[in-house]
Amino acid sequence: MGKFFASYLLILAPFFLQSCSAPSRTTLEGVRMTIPYRIVFGEALSPDAFQQAQKEIDRVFDHIDQTFNNWNPLSEISRINRTTKQTPIPLSPALFAFLCEIDHFHAFSDGRFDPTLGALKSLWLLHLKSHTIPSQELQHLYKHSSGWHLISLDKTQQTLRKLSPLVQLDLCGTVKGFAVDLLGTACAQFCQNYYVEWGGEIKTKGKHPSGRSWAVASSATPEILHLHDHAIATSGSQYQRWHVDNKTYTHILDPLTGTPLEDSSHPILAVSVINESCAFADAMATALTTFSSKQEALDWANKKHLCAYITDKNVS
């Protein structure tokens, strides 16, 4: 089983109010691809429905692992990344549809969400973990082998063509949110009130068993957020850092420069975005972490009519 690179995740937690007499509900919990998940149905499922629900959840996770997981060498996306040919590559319907969504995310984000930075990110991580910096020649080579414009999708043939042999796709910036969307669809077969969380990305439907909305906590705001038929995704810069030559680098690449954001000049700590689509919220939270200031990020979010919460180093 593969695992996901957990750099953009892990800052949301379910906020369940306790009472002396807990309402009836059904909870499924486990760990998939090294990341814990929690699913709460707003009613008690029958034993048969419980077993069927678990099978559906497992089916979704297997699908994500086999198709979209960059850390699974046997996944469809990993096979595509190993290909250096610049000829059309047939895609499964699921992966093609997801890449079409990503095409929209990239355009909406003004290029700040760019999943083609995979090879460039791998280059930097390899060097940063050794406390070194890639040479200017390598940076130039990999930077010019990155960019969504180097991916060509043929909607008629449902194929992908690389316009550079080095370009690779890193889906980690949105695939957890996408998985949560699929898990929500699976849960809807059994109950119209549910809460789905996987590694910090959350999707809700209907109401909590107590009759209130679902409540969650986020590191991007001190508020308790109440969700109804919406999802929330969070990205942050505080989880991975490396010290090289008196500088501290984060794991987040600036899509404009192709270099990791420096901790000293990057005040944003965490971003949460609320949307009906968890995949979209995940992508936009990732994009918002690349801005140089909280105010600049908030201005852009307002311009795009995004519901975003942002915390920075200046928080009291």
Swiss-Prot record:
FAD binds at residues 33, 71, 112-114, 170, 176, 253. A lipid is attached at residue 20 (N-palmitoyl cysteine). It is a lipid-anchor. Gene3D superfamilies: ApbE-like domains (3.10.520.10). Coiled coil: none annotated. The keyword Cell cycle does not apply. Pfam families: ApbE. GO terms for cellular component: plasma membrane. Its cofactor is Mg(2+). One of its GO terms (molecular function) is transferase activity. Keywords: Cell inner membrane, Cell membrane, FAD, Flavoprotein, Lipoprotein, Magnesium, Membrane, Metal-binding, Palmitate, Signal, Transferase. It is found in: Cell inner membrane. Belongs to the ApbE family. PANTHER family: FAD:PROTEIN FMN TRANSFERASE, THIAMINE BIOSYNTHESIS LIPOPROTEIN APBE. This is FAD:protein FMN transferase.
